[in-house]
C-alpha cells in the first residue's frame, strides 16, 4: 500500500491493489476512530513493532489489539460450531464481525504503516460511501464482482455488506470437510 512512498517496488511481485467504492451515495457516513487488529499465537517481535507503529502514527484513534484472551470483550462468535477453523479463518470472522458491530478500521497486525490513516476518512467522504476496501485486480475476472482484499477494511457500524460477508464465510467454514 505504501511501497511507492518509502521504497522501490519489486517488479517480480504482481500484487497491485486498487480502491473500490462500496455503497456509494451516502453523504454523512463517518468511520469511527477505532483500529482493530487481532493476533493468535505467540506474539512475534515484528508484529509487536507493527502494532506499536500503528499506535504511534495514529494517536487520534483507539487501537484495539485483540488476542484469543480478550476478543470476547468485543465480539461473541460461537467457536463451538467451528472446532476445525484455522486461526486465519477465525481472524476473518472476527474482522467482519467487529467492523459490522462497531465500525472502524480493520488492519492486519503484521501490516507496516508509515502514516496516519485519516486519509481513509477523506476518501470515504470524497466518494460518498460508508466503507472502504481494496480489490486485487489480478484475481478479478469480472469487474462487477471484484476480489476484495481483507487486510485493510473500513466502515461505519451496521454495514450489511460486512454482515453478509461474515455469514457467507461462516457457512463455508461449516461446510469444510473435517480432517
Which sequence ranges carry the predicted segments?
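N-terminal anchoring/stem segment of glycosyltransferases
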Residues: 1-78, 157
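Extracytoplasmic/secreted proteins, especially bacterial periplasmic and envelope-associated proteins
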Residues: 46-49, 94, 160, 164
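Conserved interaction-surface patches within small, structured recognition/assembly domains
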Residues: 75-90
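GT-A fold catalytic core of metal-dependent nucleotide-sugar glycosyltransferases
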Residues: 89-148
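Serine-centered coil/turn micro-motif
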Residues: 111, 159-160
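Conserved beta strand-loop-helix elements of the APE1-like EEP
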Residues: 149-158
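Catalytic core and acceptor-binding pocket of nucleotide-sugar-dependent glycosyltransferases
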Residues: 161-179
Amino acid at each position: 500500500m505504501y511501497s511507492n512512498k518509502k521504497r522501490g517496488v519489486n517488479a517480480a511481485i504482481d500484487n497491485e491493489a486498487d480502491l473500490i467504492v462500496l455503497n456509494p451515495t451516502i453523504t454523512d457516513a463517518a468511520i469511527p476512530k477505532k483500529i482493530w487488529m487481532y493476533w493468535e499465537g505467540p506474539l512475534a517481535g515484528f508484529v509487536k513493532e507493527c502494532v506499536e507503529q500503528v499506535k504511534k502514527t495514529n494517536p487520534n484513534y483507539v487501537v484495539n489489539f485483540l488476542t484469543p484472551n480478550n476478543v470476547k470483550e468485543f465480539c461473541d462468535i460461537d467457536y463451538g460450531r467451528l472446532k476445525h477453523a484455522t486461526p486465519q479463518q477465525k481472524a476473518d470472522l472476527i474482522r467482519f464481525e467487529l467492523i459490522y458491530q462497531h465500525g472502524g478500521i480493520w488492519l492486519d497486525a503484521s501490516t507496516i504503516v508509515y502514516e496516519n490513516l485519516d486519509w481513509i476518512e477523506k476518501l470515504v467522504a470524497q466518494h460518498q460511501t460508508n466503507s472502504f476496501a481494496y480489490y486485487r485486480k489480478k484475481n478479478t475476472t469480472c469487474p462487477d464482482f471484484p476480489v476484495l482484499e481483507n487486510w485493510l477494511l473500513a466502515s461505519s457500524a451496521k454495514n450489511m455488506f460486512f454482515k453478509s460477508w461474515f455469514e457467507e464465510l461462516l457457512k463455508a467454514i461449516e461446510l469444510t470437510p473435517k480432517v
